[in-house]
């Protein structure tokens, strides 16, 4: 996008959506408009992976039409306010190979390889495929998702060449590939009682019991044990007519709302995170457990999802069978990888190459060192089962050792990096978010198995003047001296030559995620008040310590449980926090503009009162699901326009006291802005129901009360046992 977009009003825009990512893009009419939108969409997608093997298309949402998505083929189809969905389709589609079947009579109990149910009857209970030897019900052999897995079977067609084709669509407007091939959609599993003998799709064992023997996918009908559900591949395909027409008007649709306010969405962070192509290693490996050296096993090893997966089956051209997993070794359970320089455990076998030691005291002995085998060369393994050149034991040893290390550079202080790696296993493909200078990953504490959050800060992001490094150290210093139930806890810090690792407690989501997950895109007053009091109590603690957060927003309010309407909250991300004594002001650039008061945006002096403005914006976006201000007008003018600030929808459903509190917080004059104490004493944040909700949380947490007081017990006439 060129610089001219900086002055474009939000009134002329489109929204690009990809999964959970949503970005508002100004719309400028010219010949290259569609190309520019496609380029921006490509940049969004590339932040999540590589596009080399997939085609990208834009589809327009039409909520009032039986066809919910329409492909964009020309710029004339795009109107202001349109919501454009980014769709990816694999360039090489898997060939659809039908089964070649004939009736079969079975002399022993046999189960359908498609649905898992027993083939019943006296004669000709089912059909058998000549190519793959699969056994099916007659009705299952022709099912749309039942594709013959035999390589070279009749009917196989060559893959489409990897070039950009025109969009192949059905009469409903969807890409053919998107409808005919699995897309990694997760299953929706529910308990099910089976009237016929049925086997598990993962382990092929019978689902036993009288009722509720297993789980059945609501959409595609696959059956699994409860214990096998985690191993079920995410390859669900919705059955026909599973998606029905929406019978309501989506508030995001063009022209569906009379309000000009900007819908709430996740604002881009200060640090752009882009997924990098991770090198992979896979191949057949010989291994055994040290306690059982006689049992030599060969499995197809694959490193994925921060764990080593050991598969029973692998076929060239098809790959591994995801349903045949022998064992999964999480990296977080590996304590060390040690090269073996000793003798063989058993004299009749060659010595193993290296050992993988785990927290469960299991030692995996991997590979066979024929060079160290004394007493003559061993019997050679058949060529078809030998270790592939790209997956020899030396490469696996180095790869696992590197995977156990935190994301770092070679010139890092090795001693510090080793100390950190011994304590924590960073799950580098599990990104939680990003802050001012670093990326936050999920990690596992090795000795306890506890999941934590690790912020990995690259010192390359800091300016040469060192202000960035000082800011980072100031953030850590603030976290080290704070101790409050409403503030995220710092557990550990480690600094190397090139990186800083900050370990904090991990929560399960943030306030913005909770708001956007609601059906109406906003919270009700009861939940809002419950969360707000927690935020204010934590903020009061910070202000009493002389600390201003300076970047308060829903993204920086973490929640303990996304499944609860009344979770505990904790404030995080102190990258912009400042020590501001009483009667002093600062002028440094801080925070996220959408939540900052005018004095910060205009580079005037600000004090801790800027956090109270942010609280007002948080209340507004939580109750309405929109931002309070547009960029096209002065904030002071918008505040004077009550009909603009508080349109009938949805503010007619909100108590007038809530509107009064927002107006007293969103004061342009710093002196007129409400303080924390005044805010907590406001009538909207009083009431027996709110008191009960807060007291219940304190009892659940089993901590000293910090949200209510004994005076509240007397005031509301309810004494709750501490």
UniProtKB/Swiss-Prot annotation:
EC number, UniProt record: 2.7.11.13
Would the keyword Metal-binding turn up in this protein's UniProt record?
A: yes
UniProt KW keywords: ATP-binding, Cytoplasm, Kinase, Magnesium, Membrane, Metal-binding, Nucleotide-binding, Phosphoprotein, Repeat, Serine/threonine-protein kinase, Transferase, Ubl conjugation, Zinc, Zinc-finger
PROSITE patterns in alphabetical order? PROTEIN_KINASE_ATP, PROTEIN_KINASE_DOM, PROTEIN_KINASE_ST, ZF_DAG_PE_1, ZF_DAG_PE_2
Q: Does the keyword Iron apply?
A: no
Record's GO cellular component, any one? Answer: cytosol
Record PTM text: Prolonged phosphorylation at Thr-588 results in ubiquitination and degradation.
Q: What is this protein's function per UniProt?
A: Converts transient diacylglycerol (DAG) signals into prolonged physiological effects, independently of PKC. Role in the regulation of growth and neuromuscular control of movement. Involved in immune response to S.aureus bacterium by activating transcription factor hlh-30 downstream of phospholipase plc-1.
The written remark on domains in the entry is: The PH domain inhibits PKD catalytic activity in the absence of DAG, either by direct steric occlusion or distortion of the PKD catalytic cleft.
Could you tell me what this protein is called?
A: Serine/threonine-protein kinase dkf-1
